[in-house]
Amino acid sequence: MFTGINHTRKEDFSVVWDLGRRCTYACSYCGPHHSNKTSPLVEIDKLKHTLDGIVKYSQLMDLYRKEPLKLDIAYTGGEPTIHPAFFEFVRYAKETYPFIRSNITTNGCYSEKKCREIMDCVSSTTLSYHTEGTPEQKKLVVANIKLMHESGYNFRINHMFHKDYFDECIELAEWFDELGITYTSRPIGDSNNKSDLLDGTAHEYTPKQLEYFKNQWTQKSKPKPKAPSGVMHMLTTEKPKAKTSLETIGRPCCNGKCLSVKVDDEWTKSFLV
């Protein structure tokens, strides 16, 4: 079933479609509410019928608009590609409704053939990289990242930084930087939630690891200065101020994002979402 429809934007009609909880991974920090091996799978006919209904609904809304809506569908899970009918379904979506812009959130752990099918049928990909995978799994994911990059496909990476594999995560981030691949360094869970720390769905990072996050986000949030004519590179020696927790340094993640919320007619900063 789909989990959300966003029709607040002026020109876009966006659907977040949860295709099920099942996943090919079993990450220690991912609770059963995010992934499992037993949740039921929706039949292909029901998937197609639901998609047909979404398109009809958006077209009905277009009758009362000067300009038609742009229909976006984001497939998520679990791992969407574990659904046995997934590739048949996205092929149907592309061939029947070529105007739909689609995205998939995936772990990238599948064959080259499936990766090429995704590139052909899905407009863009958000790939979550997890270092808890086996060496064989991670080798497969890296190969697919390289394939998407070399193919000029539209994708980005959510790089999940595991506290116990931090050096490996840094090495991979440096590889992304070398290739010019877009990625976000993401802490795992909410380190300010004690129950999440106890059950392992959140990681507590060392000061050195937090410093790495701070430097990453500071660099990514600031526009790069333009070099004067004839200058190839510009270097800066400015050091950002030290901070010691995810809350104080800010966190670009869906589960702990710094937001401004209005409370009693006052705007205040909220850490927990």
PLM regions: where:
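Canonical Radical SAM [4Fe-4S] cluster-binding loop centered on the CxxxCxxC motif
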Residues: F2-H49
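Radical SAM enzyme core and accessory elements
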Residues: M1-R9, D264-T268, V273
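Residue-level signal for mature regions of secreted extracellular proteins and peptides
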Residues: V16, G20-C23, I73, L246-E247, ...
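Radical SAM enzyme [4Fe-4S]-AdoMet core and its adjacent flexible, acidic
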Residues: S124, S128-D264
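Short cysteine clusters
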Residues: C23, C27-C30, C253-C254, C258, ...
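Active-site beta-strand/loop signature of hydrolases that rely on acidic residues for catalysis
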Residues: G77-G78
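Radical SAM/AdoMet-radical enzyme domain recognition
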Residues: L51-K56, L60-A74, H83-F176, T182-Y183
